[in-house]
């Protein structure tokens, strides 16, 4: 249901942050968003 890259990225970021927060330190949505999009 979610095909756009931004939507998928935000969904993955939300799942990862809820699941543990370990990846959160290595994956910063704002930096990735500004560079990739």
Curated annotation (Swiss-Prot):
Any matching Pfam family: Calc_CGRP_IAPP
Disulfide bonds, paired cysteine numbers: 2-7
Record's subcellular location: Secreted
UniProt keyword annotations, A-Z: Amidation, Disulfide bond, Hormone, Secreted
Stored InterPro entries: Calcitonin-like (IPR021117), Calcitonin/adrenomedullin (IPR021116), Calcitonin_CS (IPR018360), Calcitonin_gene-rel_peptide (IPR015476), Calcitonin_peptide-like (IPR001693)
Highest taxon above the source species: Eukaryota
GO BP: adenylate cyclase-activating G protein-coupled receptor signaling pathway; regulation of cytosolic calcium ion concentration
Residues that bear Phenylalanine amide: 37
Main location: secreted
Keyword Lyase: no
Listed Gene3D superfamilies: 6.10.250.2190
Keyword match Secreted: yes
Example of a GO MF term: hormone activity
GO CC term, one of those recorded: extracellular space
Role: CGRP1/CALCA is a peptide hormone that induces vasodilation mediated by the CALCRL-RAMP1 receptor complex. Dilates a variety of vessels including the coronary, cerebral and systemic vasculature. Its abundance in the CNS also points toward a neurotransmitter or neuromodulator role. It also elevates platelet cAMP. CGRP1 can also bind and activate CALCR-RAMP1 (AMYR1) receptor complex.
Family of this protein: Belongs to the calcitonin family.
Protein name per Swiss-Prot or TrEMBL: Calcitonin gene-related peptide 1
Species per Swiss-Prot/TrEMBL record: Ovis aries (Sheep)
Chain's gene name: CALCA
